[in-house]
């Protein structure tokens, strides 16, 4: 089967959706499928190469307490038509299909089976509220809908009601199979591990505030922070100015 994985974010820049797409690509190829990743260009990632097809240019912008991407091109329709005619996909798998403008245009012009995975979760979203009114046609072209969690399903169903199958993000267990526990943190103290981008949507500052409350109440739990991002300096300052112990 020939499959196109459509990501609204510039591939392979770091991020949860792109990581999801990467592992899907690798595992689908292991199962004998012919797979392409369809993305935009940005910075050093300018031209199509190998199994990566680039259309338009991606621009980063803040959205929903995180960083999103909007893709623009003066020749979107002709580029997408040429790509679809050339590749002749059996199935297109869209990730966040309503993020402008690459995914909606591909979805509108697709003659393949169209599947979508929804990753996002948030409160009220003006952009999704607007999208629910102008992208009904694109939503109707989806043959299957996946949400990575119950929370993601609840969020997207609010704006695009329909039948969603919850399939959680996979974990590459081989990567951790030979991992050896670090003796440094095997001292009987309870460890709380945070792995993710330091940004409002991930809640790293909320976690630090909760940890501070627990320490005041006598907890000796240790908070381990792994990651980086726009709130890293603020997080370090919070720890230092409040002399917050038990954080590494």
Regions found by a protein language model. Name each.
Residues 233-248:
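Nucleotide-activated donor-binding/catalytic signature segment of Leloir-type glycosyltransferases, i.e.
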